[in-house]
């Protein structure tokens, strides 16, 4: 109809995006209708809504099955014109299956078979990159011969065996040169060579014609695996009796019959039978068996030879139509239709004594591997005995080259690193040795021979231990600690005896503590604190080594601990040497301190009131006067101090940097601050104020200030407590006035005083109560706090906090 035209193709079959502007007809009633409107064909359809299609049918879509119906999602089209066998749901609507019946065009079975055969052959050819010679011969014969299909069900021929390539080469030569001699059947000589020479037919009884099984993919794979394992292990002994009993598989798969026939070459020449039999027996290297009677066909005899078994066959069915018998026999024989053709493969392969020896893939791989091995043995004679010949599997034999494992490589790397670190540590220890010897020469003047000998013996022992990287046990560490404590106590016995001779001398010694802190600290802390720190570092070493921490770290730590020990021992020796000069040093230090002398006295008095609460304040005055008297020997002490300053740049004598500690101790102190933030928490405000009061000093010194000031904040209240109980007017006034008056040096000196208090308490045998309390504190801190916090056991936390807040306010 001219005004409406024909139906819009896109609207009819999918969706038209033009909408109203589309010149073609959009009629929803006609969608999916496969009946052409006859009036429209005549050009006189005037209906507004015509249910029939105004479009010629180029295909009969209702007779074509819908492609999408067989897809996982199914057909989702409401107006799908194609044929649907099943009902479907589209947008919640149920659409019934198509009413039209698909016309089944009766195809001739030959055509069906041809179609299926073509698809199978295409699969084979696609799997094999180049068609095997058998298939080539098949293609030649196919055009010339027309063979009737046999009566038995189809057989799946697995032409794409991966390991058949070398056999194909063999068969190629054979097919071209002596085609008749290679065929095992007497009646049919040219045919049915589909996969390889090794796959002959096995079915024996003609009565079992209908019992050919179609193998599934799993069966084929499992047989391949069996075949490989038998080749490696059993050889010919694995031939099972299943060869003679094929499994009957029911199934009307008739379309594959032509597959067999097409991929087979048949020849009906009869003249070559004896030749074939002779060549077959020669090839297999077996005697002929007289199997059954003379009426047995020659096929059976060749089978008996091949399998080495007596075969009894029925005497019927021999006189069937010759062609069919030939076809079935040749099929059975050539295509290997038994249940286990691979077993026969194995025997065949083992017993092959052919004129042309075809190497299998395994043999080739073995040869290559042996060649490689020969080359490698010249290079790697050391590894020769460890290599083993994997003659069973070709894949394994090629990997006989010794490859280092990851762990071996790691071990080698570690070994190299260890050696490098040992060399470094040797250098380090020799450097340390030289430095220490030179320092001893500078500083130790009185007994140089003894000291230098002791020092030089120690580093030598240390270098040995470092070279051997010996992991110490806990018992060894304890023994070493005990020895060290003994040595240090012996070295320091002379000086404490001098100190304890008179109380005045002892007081003077305590005054030196403010600036010449190094001597006394090392003297009194040497026994406990130093041994603790060294034990701690050694324990760390031991744990690090045992837990498998990298050896470089251990050696670095060991170097540090060695340096610490050397410095400690040297300081102890200096200390023992310089004990006669203590008084001079004290006077020198007080003179250097200049202004802070006033504040030093209250600190000392506080300490004395704590330690000796029953003593009167007269002794304090004696002490201060003693300071004035000892100003004569300042020059000598100053010279010795200067010498020490040259030898050790880290030690600074000025009061502004009184906090200087020997460098190895800085790290443990920082650790103590970090690990015991909870202990220090209550003290934080005072510590910050003291840091603000500090003059700008060296960074190393500043790092230690918080801990020092915290010690002060805890120890000052207990020093004030006896001051309140014992009325000492001069001390009180001076100490009260000291915080506002003194700026930087005073605070630092007070901090050094508190440090001295704690160390002195460790050096001297304390009171029993104090001892218990210090033990408790030591347990709480886990042995990490080096300067133990002295607290008065009579006070509880609230009193201490109150006094702290009062101090902060003042």
From Swiss-Prot:
Cross-link annotation Glycyl lysine isopeptide (Lys-Gly) (interchain with G-Cter in SUMO2), location: 114, 124, 140, 478, 619
C3H1-type zinc finger segments: 2-29, 31-57, 60-86
Coiled-coil regions listed in the entry: 362-423
Chief subcellular location: nucleus
Compositional bias of kind Polar residues: 391-402, 749-762
Keywords: Coiled coil, Isopeptide bond, Metal-binding, mRNA transport, Nucleus, Phosphoprotein, Repeat, Transport, Ubl conjugation, Zinc, Zinc-finger
Phenotype when changing residue 37 to A: Reduced interaction with PABPN1, decreased localization to nuclear speckles and reduced binding to viral transcripts. Loss of interaction with PABPN1, loss of localization to nuclear speckles and reduced binding to viral transcripts
Bias (Basic and acidic residues): 309-322, 367-390, 417-432
Domain of life: Eukaryota
Phosphoserine PTM sites in chain numbering: 108, 132, 149, 171, 290, 370
Subcellular location field: Nucleus; Nucleus speckle
PROSITE patterns: ZF_C3H1
Pfam families, per database record: zf-CCCH_3
Biased composition (Acidic residues): 160-175
Inducing factors: By heat shock treatment.
Cellular component annotations (GO), alphabetically ordered: nuclear speck; nucleoplasm
Residue segments, region Disordered: 139-194, 223-258, 285-351, 367-432, 482-549, 715-768
GO terms classed as biological process: poly(A)+ mRNA export from nucleus
Ranges of biased composition (kind: Low complexity): 486-498, 729-748
Keyword Zinc-finger annotated: yes
Phosphothreonine modified-residue sites: 321
Quaternary assembly: Interacts with TREX complex components THOC2, DDX39 and POLDIP3; the interactions are ATP-dependent. Interacts with PABPN1; this interaction retains ZC3H11A in nuclear speckles. Interacts with KPNA3.
Task of the protein: Through its association with TREX complex components, may participate in the export and post-transcriptional coordination of selected mRNA transcripts, including those required to maintain the metabolic processes in embryonic cells. Binds RNA.
Protein name: Zinc finger CCCH domain-containing protein 11A
């Amino acid at each position: 109809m001219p005004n409406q035209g024909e139906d819009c193709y896109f609207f009819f079959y999918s969706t038209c995006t033009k909408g109203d502007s589309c010149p073609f007809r959009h009629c929803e009633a006609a969608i999916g209708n496969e009946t052409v409107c006859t009036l429209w064909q005549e050009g006189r359809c005037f209906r507004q809504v015509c249910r029939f299609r105004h479009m010629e049918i180029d295909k009969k879509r209702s007779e074509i099955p819908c492609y999408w119906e067989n897809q996982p999602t199914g057909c989702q089209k409401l107006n799908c014109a194609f044929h649907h066998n099943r009902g479907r749901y589209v947008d919640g609507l149920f659409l019934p299956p198509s009413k039209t019946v698909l016309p089944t065009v009766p195809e001739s079975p030959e055509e069906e078979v041809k179609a299926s055969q073509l698809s199978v052959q295409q699969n084979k050819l696609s799997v094999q990159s180049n068609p095997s010679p058998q298939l080539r011969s098949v293609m030649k014969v196919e055009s010339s011969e027309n063979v009737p299909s046999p009566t038995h069900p189809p057989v799946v021929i697995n032409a794409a065996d991966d390991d058949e390539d070398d056999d194909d080469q063999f068969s190629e030569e054979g097919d071209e040169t002596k085609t008749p001699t290679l065929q095992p059947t007497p009646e049919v000589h040219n045919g049915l060579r589909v996969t390889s020479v090794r796959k002959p037919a096995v079915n024996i009884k003609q009565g079992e014609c209908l019992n050919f099984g179609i193998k599934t993919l799993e069966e084929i794979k499992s047989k391949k695996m069996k075949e490989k394992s038998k080749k490696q292990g059993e050889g010919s002994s694995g031939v099972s009796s299943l060869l003679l009993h094929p499994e009957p598989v029911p199934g009307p798969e008739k379309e594959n019959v032509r597959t067999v026939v097409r991929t087979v070459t048949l020849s009906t020449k009869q003249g070559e039978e004896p030749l074939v039999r002779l060549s077959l027996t020669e090839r297999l290297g077996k005697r002929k068996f007289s199997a059954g009677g003379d009426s047995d066909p020659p096929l059976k005899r060749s089978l008996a030879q091949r399998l080495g078994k007596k075969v009894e066959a029925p005497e019927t069915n021999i006189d069937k139509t010759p062609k069919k018998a030939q076809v079935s026999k040749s099929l059975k024989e050539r295509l290997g239709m038994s249940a286990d053709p691979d077993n026969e493969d194995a025997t065949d392969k083992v017993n092959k004594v052919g004129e042309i020896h075809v190497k299998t893939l395994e043999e080739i791989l073995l040869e290559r591997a042996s060649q490689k091995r020969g080359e490698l043995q010249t290079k790697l004679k050391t590894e020769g005995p460890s290599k083993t010949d994997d003659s069973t599997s070709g894949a394994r034999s090629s990997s006989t080259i010794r490859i280092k494992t990851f762990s071996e490589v790691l071990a080698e790397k570690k070994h190299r690193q260890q050696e490098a670190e040992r060399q470094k540590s040797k250098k380090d220890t020799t450097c340390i040795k030289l430095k220490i010897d030179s320092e001893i020469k500078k500083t130790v003047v009185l007994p140089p021979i003894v000291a230098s000998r002791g020092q030089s013996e120690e580093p030598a022992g240390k270098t040995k231990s470092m070279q051997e990287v010996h992991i110490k046990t806990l018992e060894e560490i304890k023994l070493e600690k005990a020895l060290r404590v003994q040595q240090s106590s012996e070295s320091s016995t002379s000086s404490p005896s001098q100190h304890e001779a008179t109380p005045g001398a002892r007081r003077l010694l305590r005054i030196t503590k403010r600036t010449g802190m190094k001597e006394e600290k090392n003297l009194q802390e040497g026994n406990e604190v130093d041994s603790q720190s060294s034990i701690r570092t050694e324990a760390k070493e031991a744990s690090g080594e045992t837990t498998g921490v990298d050896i470089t770290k251990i050696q670095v730590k060991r170097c540090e601990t060695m340096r610490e020990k050397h410095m400690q021992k040297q300081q102890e020796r200096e200390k023992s040497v310089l004990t006669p000069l203590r008084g001079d040093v004290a006077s020198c230090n007080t003179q250097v301190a200049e202004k802070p002398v006033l504040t030093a006295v209250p600190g000392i008095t506080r300490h004395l009131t704590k330690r000796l609460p029953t003593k009167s304040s007269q002794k304090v005055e004696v002490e201060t006067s003693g300071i004035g008297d000892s100003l004569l020997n300042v020059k000598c002490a100053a010279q010795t101090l200067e010498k020490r300053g040259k030898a050790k740049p880290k030690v600074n004598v000025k009061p502004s940097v009184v906090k200087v500690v020997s460098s190895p101790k800085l790290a443990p102190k920082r650790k103590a601050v970090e690990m015991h933030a909870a202990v220090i928490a209550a003290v934080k405000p005072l510590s910050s104020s003291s840091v603000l009061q500090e003059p700008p000093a060296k960074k190393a010194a500043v790092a230690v200030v918080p801990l020092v000031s915290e010690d002060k904040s805890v120890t000052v209240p207990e020093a004030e407590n006896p001051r309140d109980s014992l009325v000492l007017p001069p001390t009180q006034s001076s100490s009260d006035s000291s915080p506002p008056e003194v700026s930087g040096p005073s605070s630092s000196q007070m901090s050094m005083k508190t440090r001295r208090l704690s160390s002195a308490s460790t050096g001297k045998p304390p009171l029993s109560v104090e001892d218990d309390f210090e033990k408790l504190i030591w347990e709480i801190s886990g042995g990490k706090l080096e300067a133990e916090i002295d607290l008065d056991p009579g006070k509880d936390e609230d009193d201490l906090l109150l006094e702290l807040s009062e101090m902060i306010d003042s």
